[in-house]
Every structure is written in structure tokens, then in C-alpha cells.
UniProtKB/Swiss-Prot annotation:
It comes from the Bacteria. Its cofactor is a divalent metal cation. This is dTTP/UTP pyrophosphatase. It is found in: Cytoplasm. Gene3D superfamilies: 3.90.950.10. One of its GO terms (biological process) is nucleotide metabolic process.
Length: 194
């Protein structure tokens, strides 16, 4: 069996991967996300970011055999504008206010790199999420929990912001940060059967 490495510091991704895989390593990527400019194609952008993360970790372990590195990047898009992690509370408020009462998309790019052969596969998942109308007080109370500050789009569906979600169309785990169904099919393509 190949050693599987998750190129992510995200606790959410680690928890999700543990649901389908008992044994894996974590090596945090030092990939500079700003090195890839956004050019209006969100699926391509998230796949390039995921590949950059996987290759960054792959370079660190080139001398080891039988390693597969999983890279992932998740972002929120609204009106074809990328909403990353908020810079501050004001930014978080503006993001949540924009999402209030509207539908947005959550994209995750996935990349799996076979370090020995240098073979890489990439794919993406898009999930549509509709928020109910939020009051300013709801948004402020949520921001004051600190929860939105490390999350794309300034919310985590698996936490207190779950009550904001009116409906979801697509993979729930994608919105959390790691689309398990797509990851499973990609691992199978790389010869790993869970």
C-alpha cells in the first residue's frame, strides 16, 4: 500500500480524511498561493492551487518511495468573485452580508501526486449553497465567535453557520473542505482502494 500524505494544516480536512482512511501522514505545504493569479476560471484556479500544494510537499519527500500526496484548495465564489478567508472582521461582515439571502458556489480543487512516477491527476467539485436572509445582529454575533476568520467565505457549514444554510445542492463535504466522494474516485484511479 502506498503511503498517503495530506498536504494541509486544516483540521477539518484531517478529520474528514480520517473518515475514509485510517493511516496517513500530514506534511504542511509551504506553497505560495499568490504565485498563481486568478484569471476568471475558478475550476482551473482551484485545481492549480491544489496541484501547487501537492507538488510543494512532493519536493520535500522525493527520496522516499510509494508516496501519494493529496493537495486540496477550497474557495467560495459569489457572482464570479472569489471570496477567500476574511482579512479582518469588517471583511468577514461584508462577505456574510453579500451571501445573505443569496446562492453562492463552493469550489474545491483536488490533486493527487504519485511522487515516484511524478504522475498527477487533478479534478474539482462545485457545490451550490443558499443562505437565508441574515440580520446584521446575526452576522455580528457569528463573527464575534471567531469562527469565520480562518474560513473561505467567512463561514463554516459544520459549525454555528450551519443555521444560515437554507439549502445545498451538491457535496456537503466539499463545503466543509474535502469532497470525499471525488477524493475516493481519484484515489481509486491512482490504485488505492479504500
Amino acid at each position: 500500500m502506498k503511503n498517503i500524505i495530506l498536504a494541509s494544516a486544516s483540521e477539518r480536512r484531517q478529520e474528514l480524511l480520517k473518515r475514509i482512511l485510517e493511516d496517513f501522514q500530514i506534511i504542511v505545504s509551504d506553497f505560495d498561493e499568490s504565485s498563481i493569479p486568478f484569471k476568471d476560471n475558478i475550476p482551473s484556479y482551484v485545481m492549480n492551487l491544489a496541484e501547487g500544494k501537492a507538488r510543494s510537499v512532493g519536493k520535500k519527500i522525493m527520496d522516499q518511495d510509494s508516496n501519494l500526496v493529496i493537495g486540496c484548495d477550497t474557495l467560495v465564489a459569489f457572482n464570479n468573485k472569489v471570496l477567500g478567508k476574511p482579512k479582518d472582521k469588517k471583511d468577514a461582515f461584508e462577505m456574510l452580508q453579500a451571501l445573505s439571502g443569496n446562492e453562492h458556489e463552493v469550489y474545491s480543487g483536488l490533486a493527487i501526486l504519485d511522487v515516484k512516477s511524478n504522475k498527477i491527476i487533478t479534478d474539482f467539485v462545485c457545490t451550490k449553497v443558499k443562505f437565508s436572509k441574515l440580520t446584521s445582529l446575526q452576522i455580528e454575533k457569528y463573527i464575534n465567535t471567531g469562527d469565520p476568520m480562518d474560513k473561505a467565505g467567512a463561514y463554516g457549514i459544520q459549525g454555528k453557520a450551519g443555521v444560515f444554510v437554507e439549502n445545498i445542492n451538491g457535496c456537503y463535504y466539499n463545503v466543509v473542505g474535502l469532497p470525499l466522494n471525488k477524493l475516493n474516485s481519484m484515489l481509486m484511479e491512482m490504485g488505492v482502494n479504500l
